[in-house]
Structures are given as structure tokens and as C-alpha cells.
């Protein structure tokens, strides 16, 4: 199943995409208003649905206000791990020469989330080195702690796409990554959230275009740490909750991997596409 969160008649609603036509949306009755309500309900979705056309709504992030922010995994594609460590921007204690021995985990606050089509402020008063990162993100569907790898997929509800926008100068200057990762608007998310049956984790393409130029192109088969491994490690002594979102890392081809580095500028358009999840597109000012 494929869900979107929308604004319709001045109300935030969550909708189910019609299987035969993604432009035909079934609004789930209130009080359901975001994907979190769908995840909490499990299989008990209310009916009947009110059907509308996608042109009659504004698409929002699947979860416009995450309960606990977003957990993110850094340097989880081998080629990106190498390009980042060689870029001169990694001054953190996680600095590696080839790939990390354990998942590198950081977070983005909920205020960083914006939806598809949102115009992202480059915040020049705070940073001059804004970079893009295409990522597949995983939604957790039930509480769990100390989750074994072999059971981890039982805790996954589904997936979405995010752009883990990063202020590279702040990431380098402060060594820990939080201040470079969680600026306002620096986590575009969407356009939809899909259940696990829609995505083949062993073979899902992740791409990113900047102004129609292909910059990132990889497959989830290239992940250093798999989704089950990531969930197992994060849940060690830490209870994951329904609606928690885990971004799985970005492929090679980010701006700092270019020679010279190519950072985003006003007027740029970034288009992230993940197979069977959709296209997340945002412009920058």
C-alpha cells in the first residue's frame, strides 16, 4: 500500500493511493491525519474513504511532525564512505579510511522536516556549504528493544525517501554532526510512504539529480550495514517506537565528493528518486 499525507480543505489528512491510479487518493476519515495514525492502527483502518484527485490537495511530508526526530546512519555506502573520508570535511571521531566497523548514527530534529515541493532556505547566515544526500528511510511499526538481526524486519512498517541536507562547514567545524544536519528545512521527505511489500531491499535504486544532472546513482544492495543490522544495533538498550524513522545512508556523488566541491546554490532543483517509493523534488533559495 502507498500512503500520502496531504492538506485538503485546510485540514491535514492522510490518504491511500489508488492501486490503479496514483493521482486518485482515498482520504482516510478523521481523526486520522498523518501516517503516524496509520502505523498506530495496524491493519484497522477506518472506512469508507473519500476519493479526491491529487490536484485537489497539497502534498506534505508523510510525517510532517515526527514524534522523536529522525535517526540517521552515516557513511553506509562504501564509495561514499571513501569519498567523505578523503574530502577533508570529516573531522569527527568517526573518521575512517575505508568503511566504518559499526554504524555511525546521528539524528535530525523534527523541525528540519519539509514536504515534497517545498522551497528550502539555504540559510546563508548559518552556512555557505549546503550539500544534498539521497536516502531511503525506514518506518518502525511497533516498540522494540534489543532486537535480534533475524527478527528486525518484523518491526518495519515501510519506507519513504528523504534528502539529508547537510551544512558541511558546520559538520566539520563542530565535529559532531548534529549542528550540520538539523537546520530548519534540511530534511525534505516524501512524496509518499509505502509498505514493505512495495520495496525489494536487496535491489532498490537510489538516484539524485541536481538541475537534471545525475549526481548519485546506487542500489541498496551496496549498503555496508543492512536494514536489519541497523535496527538491531540502534535498538541495543534503546526502545524503538512506532513511527520512528531511520535514514539508511547516502550513496557516493554528494557535493563534497566533487573536485572541486559543488555546493547547492539559490535556484537549484534537487530530484531524488527511489524505486517504488517515488520522486522527491525540492528547490532552493
Annotate the PLM regions.
Residues 1-103, 271:
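N-terminal non-catalytic cap/leader segment that marks the start of a structured domain
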Residues 91, 98-101, 105-108, 151-177, ...:
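Flexible glycine-rich active-site/ligand-binding loops centered on an Asp-His dyad
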Amino acid at each position: 500500500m502507498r500512503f500520502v499525507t496531504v492538506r485538503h480543505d485546510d485540514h491535514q489528512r492522510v490518504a491511500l493511493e489508488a492501486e490503479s491510479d496514483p493521482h486518485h487518493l482515498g482520504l482516510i476519515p478523521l481523526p486520522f491525519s498523518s501516517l503516524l495514525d496509520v502505523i498506530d492502527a495496524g491493519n484497522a483502518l477506518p472506512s469508507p474513504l473519500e476519493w479526491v484527485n491529487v490536484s485537489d490537495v497539497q502534498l506534505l511530508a508523510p510525517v510532517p511532525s515526527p514524534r522523536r526526530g529522525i535517526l540517521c546512519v552515516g557513511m553506509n555506502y562504501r564509495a561514499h564512505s571513501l569519498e567523505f573520508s578523503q574530502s577533508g570535511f570529516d573531522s569527527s571521531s568517526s573518521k575512517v579510511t575505508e568503511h566504518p566497523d559499526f554504524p555511525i548514527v546521528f539524528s535530525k530534529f523534527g523541525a528540519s522536516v519539509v514536504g515534497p515541493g517545498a522551497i528550502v532556505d539555504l540559510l546563508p547566515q548559518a552556512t555557505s556549504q549546503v550539500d544534498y544526500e539521497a536516502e531511503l528511510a525506514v518506518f518502525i511499526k511497533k516498540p522494540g528493544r534489543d532486537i535480534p538481526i533475524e527478527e528486525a524486519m518484523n518491526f518495519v512498517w515501510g519506507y519513504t525517501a528523504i534528502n539529508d541536507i547537510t551544512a558541511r562547514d558546520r559538520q566539520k567545524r563542530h565535529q559532531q554532526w548534529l549542528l550540520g544536519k538539523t537546520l530548519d528545512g534540511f530534511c525534505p521527505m516524501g512524496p509518499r510512504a509505502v509498505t514493505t511489500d512495495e520495496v525489494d531491499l536487496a535491489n532498490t535504486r537510489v538516484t539524485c539529480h541536481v538541475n537534471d544532472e545525475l549526481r548519485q546513482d546506487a542500489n541498496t544492495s551496496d549498503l555496508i550495514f543492512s536494514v536489519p543490522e541497523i535496527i538491531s544495533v540502534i535498538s541495543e538498550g534503546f526502545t524503538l517506537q512506532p513511527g520512528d524513522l531511520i535514514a539508511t545512508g547516502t550513496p557516493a556523488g554528494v557535493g563534497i565528493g566533487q573536485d572541486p566541491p559543488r555546493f547547492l546554490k539559490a535556484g537549484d532543483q534537487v530530484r531524488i528518486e527511489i524505486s517504488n517509493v517515488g520522486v522527491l523534488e525540492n528547490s532552493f533559495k
